[in-house]
């Protein structure tokens, strides 16, 4: 009999995983403060990593990688892309981005001039001068100059401003209380017809205890309800595809797709009929490359291969596609929710790949088979 504890009662994904484990008959749930467990389904923040792996004779597995925030916080992701040797030279799939701290945080501002040594020791150096230099250069060259400011820890469309005015973006951030990212806005996205609408793509990725990377074969497009207008920044419903914003502010929510969600099979049919291309060849190949590049760049920092406990993690990668069919990584979510119709299959995959590979069913000598729902990258 294996044992597990649940420390996050708000996760719908791990509520389903918990249900599946109990249904096997060989998993028992313990009180959340019991230290002698095999599996912890923990909370994303303040997880007690330091207390794991110290119970004699007990293998312990936890559902997060310590340090995964290097990918999952917007400012940290920008820093990773700029400083990682694996990414900084070849990363053409991440929008131009700058980390900006509100001036009320008393953060040193990095000089933009060449030849001046940057204060490397201070990890909170502000990049606003670099942003302004790029902004002014684009303005002089007559390039598209729309940018988006996003709170590093924000979610559900909160803490966001889209503007073509640098001063407006910086004033917005300086009025806030936390670090933001200013990112080049994708001004020419691929649009869905009918409706001339924006979308983004959510892909779910599972990293097991051996740092094998699995992509869930199903993905979802989160679609806008209103026609895209690059000049109207005030209408969030045509720019931001977050469910919360679409549901609350758009009178056309659900008009084109139920719940403003389109799944991969329908999207592939759309691409085939509208553009004479396939999802796999035109978009998924790029998505797989980006996912693998990101995760391999942080493996040395977060892998648990040589620690007394082991980790796995489900991640949500969010992408956009431009009109040239180039895929751009927008952000990575460390505790992603899941579309309702996908819960059963996705959560069964977590059990089969991430949990049963460490704690196999006691009545079988067979190695658990990789579910067809996941593709190993």
From Swiss-Prot:
**Known catalysed reaction(s)?**
C-terminal L-alpha-aminoacyl-L-glutamyl-L-glutamyl-[tubulin] + L-tyrosine + ATP = C-terminal L-alpha-aminoacyl-L-glutamyl-L-glutamyl-L-tyrosyl-[tubulin] + ADP + phosphate + H(+)
Organism this protein belongs to = Mus musculus
User: Which molecular function GO terms apply here?
Assistant: ATP binding; tubulin-tyrosine ligase activity
GO CC, any one term: spindle microtubule
Q: Which family does it belong to?
A: Belongs to the tubulin--tyrosine ligase family.
Which cofactors does this protein require? Mg(2+); K(+)
User: What Gene3D superfamilies does its record include?
Assistant: 3.40.50.11480, ATP-grasp fold, B domain
Describe, as the record does, how this protein assembles with itself and its partners: Monomer.
Q: Which UniProt keywords apply?
A: ATP-binding, Ligase, Magnesium, Nucleotide-binding, Potassium
Report the EC code(s) recorded for this entry. 6.3.2.25
Name of the protein in question: Tubulin--tyrosine ligase
Report domain TTL positions. Answer: 3-370
Q: From its record, what is one biological process in GO terms?
A: regulation of metaphase plate congression
Q: What does this protein do?
A: Catalyzes the post-translational addition of a tyrosine to the C-terminal end of detyrosinated alpha-tubulin.
Q: Does the keyword Acyltransferase apply?
A: no
């Amino acid at each position: 009999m294996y044992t597990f504890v649940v420390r996050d009662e708000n996760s719908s994904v791990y509520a389903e995983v918990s249900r599946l484990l109990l249904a096997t008959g060989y998993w028992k749930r313990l009180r959340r403060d019991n230290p002698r467990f095999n599996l912890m389904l923990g909370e994303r923040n303040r997880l007690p990593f330091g207390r794991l792996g110290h119970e004699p004779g007990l293998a312990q597995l936890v559902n997060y990688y310590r340090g995964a925030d290097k990918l999952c916080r917007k400012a940290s992701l920008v820093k990773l892309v700029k400083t990682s040797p694996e990414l900084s030279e070849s990363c053409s799939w991440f929008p131009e981005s700058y980390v900006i701290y509100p001036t009320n945080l008393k953060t040193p501002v990095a000089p933009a001039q060449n030849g001046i040594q940057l204060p490397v020791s201070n990890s909170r150096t502000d990049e606003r001068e670099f942003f302004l230099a790029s902004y002014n250069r684009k303005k002089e060259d007559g390039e598209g100059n729309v940018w988006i400011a996003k709170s590093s820890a924000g979610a559900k469309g909160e803490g966001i401003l889209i503007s073509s005015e640098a001063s407006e973006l910086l004033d917005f951030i300086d009025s806030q209380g936390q670090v933001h990212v200013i990112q080049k806005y994708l001004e020419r996205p691929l649009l869905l017809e009918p409706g001339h609408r924006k979308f983004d793509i959510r892909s779910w990725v599972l990293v097991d205890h051996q740092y094998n990377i699995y992509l869930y074969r199903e993905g979802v497009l989160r679609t806008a309800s209103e026609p895209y207008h690059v000049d109207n920044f005030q209408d969030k419903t045509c720019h931001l595809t977050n469910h919360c914003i679409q549901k609350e502010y758009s009178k056309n929510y659900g008009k084109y797709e139920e719940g403003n969600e389109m799944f991969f099979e329908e999207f592939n049919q759309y691409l085939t009929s509208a553009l004479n291309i396939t999802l796999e060849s035109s978009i998924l190949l790029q998505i797989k490359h980006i996912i693998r590049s990101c995760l391999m760049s942080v493996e040395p920092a977060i892998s648990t291969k040589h620690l007394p406990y082991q980790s796995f993690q489900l991640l949500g990668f969010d992408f956009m596609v431009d009109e040239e069919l180039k895929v751009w990584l927008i952000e990575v979510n460390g505790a992603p929710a899941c579309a309702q119709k996908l819960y059963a299959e996705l959560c069964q995959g977590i059990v089969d790949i991430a949990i049963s590979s460490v704690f196999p069913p006691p009545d079988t000598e067979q190695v658990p088979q990789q579910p067809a729902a996941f593709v190993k990258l």
